[in-house]
UniProtKB/Swiss-Prot annotation:
It comes from Zaire ebolavirus (strain Mayinga-76). One of its GO terms (cellular component) is viral nucleocapsid. This is Transcriptional activator VP30. Keywords: Activator, Host cytoplasm, Host-virus interaction, Inhibition of host innate immune response by virus, Metal-binding, Phosphoprotein, RNA-binding, Suppressor of RNA silencing, Transcription, Viral immunoevasion, Viral nucleoprotein, Virion, Zinc, Zinc-finger. Homohexamer; hexamerization is essential for RNA binding. Interacts with the nucleoprotein/NP; this interaction plays both essential and inhibitory roles in viral RNA synthesis. Interacts with VP35. Interacts with host STAU1. Interacts (via C-terminus) with host RBBP6 isoform 1. Interacts with host DICER1; this interaction prevents TARBP2/TRBP binding to DICER1 and thus allows the virus to counteract host RNA silencing.
């Protein structure tokens, strides 16, 4: 359509419009040069450029990335899924309007809640728990080794029917263990998480953001926001995946750092050496 319109116009007009376009591009590039010049001057004047990211004001309440969703394909096709083996996400909020309409149209009897096994809402008061919420006498001293043994134990459990206070404590365990990884390991943690859960690359951004924000969480505020804003099923999926992958990855990416720290371990305390986060990988520490 455009080509035939071009052909019908006089050559001069066509030429003029192209020239005009070129002129426009040149104008942009010259303004870019000016910008670069100004940037160089300001940089050389101060020699220090503070990253703008530190000037962002904290937004309250905290916004949490959406939980990674792996929606059941049967549900997406508009059929109710009644397989007891299906481990996919069966939440209706995850469906598009069209998929939801299909589902409603096909549904003839029975209660949706019953068939979709919708989990009970969690106790939101546990977002910022106190020590009293975890009724317990004085327990063992918490060392890194204790954390690893605890994570190994819970990685083997089915936590779908677990009580809320324990689930909340498991979220804290994940947060604490995330912070034992070096920052450079977080993208590997994210990739391994996606692979284990069979999630697409479109979920990489929210998963990575959760790990990054747990890693830099001050005072547990992001952890509390996660508990309040994610549903129980999403929390269970995330925690289960993390506990299973965290123990397989070395907690420090740099072999140089690890070998350097190894030289500092006192000879008499070799049995205790594994309480140092940098001495070896999670998996090494986990084996008796």
């Amino acid at each position: 359509m455009e080509a035939s319109y071009e052909r019908g116009r006089p050559r001069a007009a066509r030429q003029h419009s192209r020239d005009g376009h070129d002129h426009h591009v040149r104008a942009r590039s010259s303004s870019r040069e000016n910008y670069r010049g100004e940037y160089r001057q300001s940089r050389s004047a101060s020699q220090v450029r503070v990253p703008t990211v530190f000037h962002k004001k904290r937004v309250e309440p905290l916004t949490v990335p959406p939980a990674p969703k792996d929606i059941c394909p049967t549900l997406k096709k508009g059929f109710l899924c009644d397989s007891s083996f299906c481990k996919k996400d069966h939440q209706l909020e995850s469906l598009t309007d069209r998929e939801l309409l299909l589902l409603i149209a096909r549904k003839t009897c029975g209660s949706v809640e019953q068939q979709l096994n919708i989990t009970a809402p969690k106790d939101s008061r546990l977002a910022n728990p106190t020590a009293d919420d975890f009724q317990q006498e004085e327990g063992p001293k918490i060392t890194l080794l204790t954390l690893i043994k605890t994570a190994e134990h819970w990685a083997r459990q089915d936590i779908r029917t677990i009580e809320d206070s324990k689930l909340r404590a498991l979220l804290t365990l994940c947060a604490v263990m995330t912070r034992k990884f070096s920052k450079s390991q977080l993208s590997l943690l994210c990739e391994t998480h996606l692979r284990r859960e069979g999630l697409g690359q479109d979920q990489a951004e929210p998963v990575l953001e959760v790990y990054q924000r747990l890693h830099s969480d001050k005072g547990g505020s992001f952890e509390a926001a996660l508990w309040q804003q994610w549903d129980r099923q999403s929390l269970i999926m995330f925690i289960t995946a993390f506990l299973n992958i965290a123990l397989q990855l070395p907690c420090e990416s740099s072999a140089v750092v690890v070998s350097g720290l190894r030289t500092l371990v006192p000879q008499s305390d070799n049995e205790e050496a594994s309480t140092n986060p940098g001495t070896c990988s999670w998996s090494d520490e986990g084996t008796p």
